[in-house]
Regions:
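Initiator methionine at the very start of the polypeptide chain
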Residues: 1-2, 284
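Active-site nucleotide/adenylate-binding loops and adjacent lid/helix of ATP-dependent enzymes
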Residues: 2-187
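Active-site flanking residues adjacent to catalytic metal/cofactor-binding acidic residues
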Residues: 136, 198, 212
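A residue-level signal for conserved active-site and pocket-lining positions in enzyme catalytic cores
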Residues: 147, 200, 214
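A long amphipathic alpha-helix within ATP-dependent nucleotide-binding catalytic cores
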Residues: 161-209, 230-233, 237-238, 242, ...
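C-terminal active-site "lid" helix and adjoining low-complexity regulatory extension at the edge
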Residues: 204-284
Length: 284
């Protein structure tokens, strides 16, 4: 049985997925796309992945992988010094009773679009009232930055937005966002998984830094960050379950064991996994 590390992608990989695949090929990894079931069981114990929730849950369940998630209440438990606004973890039912503008997003996943709503009446009615959401007073960010964190240090970073408009650019080594990110990570200490993504930004009104949100490293856009360094973080965040560190166990995602071909379906005919013998062409 091969012990060569594998890097797995969904059929329609994003630009970040392709860049990470190129980095994995350079490391000599076995890079594959998985068009559908069955998932090759020979990959168990040596696989890492990058992809959306449904794909990640299906593959992780089949291959006994551990996926690391940030805590749902991370933003809600941070002091105002780090958030620059009041944030609370509540239920969707409670959010529907909002009578003032609030920024509302699912605490996990993307079950509905995040955004500012004038009140709670426009929130999705088809979702259960007990669904946990983050609710915050609206703020505007002049610039936003993505920090890929590994073992308590910022491993890779990129700007990704200016006044809410996508605008990615590499960060110089001593950029203030890196210092603020390090301060946040030091404050959270054991309250973070060893591999995670933190988004931080500069508030438009005060010019102060604040945490935007935390995300799973296994499906976060790299933007203009170094793909090699991002891959280090992704591999820790999505890898064999038997390799998970004890300190990361509280952050291990409960994979649903989904067997949903829609999560892995390609425009091509479903079949066995397809090897990537050379770096893929990056497209948008």
């Amino acid at each position: 049985m091969s012990t060569r590390r594998s890097f797995l992608l969904p059929p329609r990989a994003t630009t970040t997925g392709r860049l990470l695949a190129e980095a994995a090929v350079r490391r000599g990894m076995d890079v594959r796309t998985l068009p559908g079931h069955p998932i090759p069981t020979d990959l168990r114990g040596r696989a890492h992945l990058y992809g959306g929730e449904r794909f990640a849950d299906a593959v992780a369940s089949a291959l006994d992988m551990a996926l690391l998630d940030p805590p749902l209440d991370l933003l809600a438990t941070l002091p105002a010094y780090f958030t620059g606004r009041h944030v609370e973890l509540i239920t969707l039912g409670q959010a529907r009773r909002h009578r003032v503008p609030r920024f509302v997003k699912p605490a996990a996943g993307k079950l509905f679009p995040a955004g500012v709503r004038p009140n709670g009446t426009g929130l999705p009615s088809h979702l259960p009232a007990e669904l946990r959401v983050l609710s915050a007073e609206p703020v505007a960010f002049a610039e936003e930055y993505r920090l890929h964190v590994l073992d308590g240090e910022v491993r890779a970073a990129s700007r990704y937005a200016v006044f809410g408009v996508l605008d990615s650019a590499p960060l110089p080594p001593k950029h203030p966002a890196l210092g603020f990110g390090a301060e946040v990570v030091n404050h959270l200490a054991s309250g973070l998984p060893s591999a995670v993504v933190l988004d931080v930004g500069i508030l438009s009104d005060s010019g102060q830094f604040a945490v935007v949100e935390a995300n799973e490293a296994w499906f976060s856009n790299a933007y203009a960050a170094d793909a090699e360094r991002v891959l280090d973080v992704v591999m820790r965040a999505a890898g064999p379950a038997h390799e998970i560190r004890d300190t990361d166990r509280p952050f291990a995602r409960r994979t649903a064991g989904i067997r949903d071909d829609d999560a892995m379906r390609s425009a091509q005919q479903p079949g066995t996994s397809r090897h990537l013998s050379a770096g893929p062409t990056a497209t948008t």
